[in-house]
C-alpha cells in the first residue's frame, strides 16, 4: 500500500521555495479582462468522469494544473490523461502540478488507462506526464506501455502524446518511440528563450527544439506539435522568432494561449494579450507553414485536440 501523500502541501509556496528566481507574492494581481472566461467546476458529467478516473487510479493534467477549460472538456467526456503520478521532479513556477519525490511507477497504470479509454469510448486521447528525472529512461518505457495497451484494446483510437524533454535521454527516448510512434508527438516550448531561467528552470530551449526535430526526422509522417503560453513578459518579435525556430525544426502544429496564474505563489501575469493579437499570431504562423494553428486566450495544448488535428478554428 502506498502511504498517502498530501499533494496540496507539495504545491504553491513549498514548490517555489528553492527557486533561484522566485515569484513576487506581494505583487498586485492584474484584473482579468472580459475575454478571459473560466467556469466553476460542477455538473453530473464532471463528477462521473472524476469518479471513473479515481476508480482506475488515473489522473488528468486538467485537474492537477487547474486548467480553466476543465469543465468544458469534462462535460464533453474528454480529458488529457497524466501518467506516472501526480508529483513532478521539476518546479516550474507557472505550473500547479506538485513537486517532490515521486512514487514508484504503477505497473498496472497502462492497462487501467487502456480500459478507461475503452469504457469512455474515446476516439482521440491525449497522454501527458510529469517530468520523471528520477527514472533512468525519463519514463519513456512507461509511455510505450501505455501506447501499446491502448492500441491493443482500442486500435482505432488516435493517440497524441505530450512529452517532457527527456533531459539527457533524447536518443534513448527516440529509440523506444521507434516501435510505437503516436499519431501526434507534442512537446511544448512554453515561452521565449530569454525567459527560460524564470519560466522553465531546469529546461533548455535548444534542447527542446532538438527533441522535436529529431523525432520528426525519424517519423516524417507523424505530426509534430508544440505550444506557447503568452503574457509572461515576452515581446511580439520574440514570439515570432520562436515560431520561425519551430518551423526550422519541422514542427507541423502550434497552440498559443494566455498564461493564467494559479495562485499568488506562482509566476505573475505580466499582461493579458488581446484576442486580436492571438489572431495575428495565428495568421503569421500559417504563413510560416504550420499546417494547424490554434491561437486564442483560452487555448491550451490539448484543448479540443481532436478538433485541432482536423483544422477546426479553435480560439
UniProtKB/Swiss-Prot annotation:
Which free-text remark accompanies the cofactor? Binds 2 [4Fe-4S] clusters per subunit. One cluster is coordinated with 3 cysteines and an exchangeable S-adenosyl-L-methionine.
Q: In which pathway does it act?
A: Protein modification; protein lipoylation via endogenous pathway; protein N(6)-(lipoyl)lysine from octanoyl-[acyl-carrier-protein]: step 2/2
Q: Per the record, what are the reactions this protein catalyses?
A: [[Fe-S] cluster scaffold protein carrying a second [4Fe-4S](2+) cluster] + N(6)-octanoyl-L-lysyl-[protein] + 2 oxidized [2Fe-2S]-[ferredoxin] + 2 S-adenosyl-L-methionine + 4 H(+) = [[Fe-S] cluster scaffold protein] + N(6)-[(R)-dihydrolipoyl]-L-lysyl-[protein] + 4 Fe(3+) + 2 hydrogen sulfide + 2 5'-deoxyadenosine + 2 L-methionine + 2 reduced [2Fe-2S]-[ferredoxin]
Q: Where in the cell is it found?
A: Cytoplasm
**What EC number(s) has UniProt assigned to this enzyme?**
2.8.1.8
* SMART domains, alphabetized: Elp3
The molecular function terms in GO held by this entry are: 4 iron, 4 sulfur cluster binding; lipoate synthase activity; metal ion binding
Entry-linked InterPro entries: Aldolase_TIM (IPR013785), Elp3/MiaA/NifB-like_rSAM (IPR006638), LIAS_N (IPR031691), Lipoyl_synth (IPR003698), rSAM (IPR007197)
Kindly list the GO CC terms recorded for this protein: cytoplasm
For this UniProt entry, what is the primary localization, expressed as one broad class?
Answer: cytoplasm
Give the PROSITE patterns listed for this entry.
RADICAL_SAM
Q: Which residues bind [4Fe-4S] cluster 2?
A: 88, 92, 95
Q: What single Pfam family name could you report for this chain, choosing any that match?
A: Radical_SAM
* Alphabetically ordered keywords of this record: 4Fe-4S, Cytoplasm, Iron, Iron-sulfur, Metal-binding, S-adenosyl-L-methionine, Transferase
What is the required cofactor set for this protein? Answer: [4Fe-4S] cluster
Q: Where is the Radical SAM core domain?
A: 74-292
Name the residues that bind [4Fe-4S] cluster 1. 62, 67, 73, 302
Entry-linked NCBIfam families: lipA, PRK05481.1, PRK12928.1
Q: Which family does it belong to?
A: Belongs to the radical SAM superfamily. Lipoyl synthase family.
Q: What is this protein called?
A: Lipoyl synthase
Species name: Vesicomyosocius okutanii subsp. Calyptogena okutanii (strain HA)
Task: List the gene name.
Answer: lipA
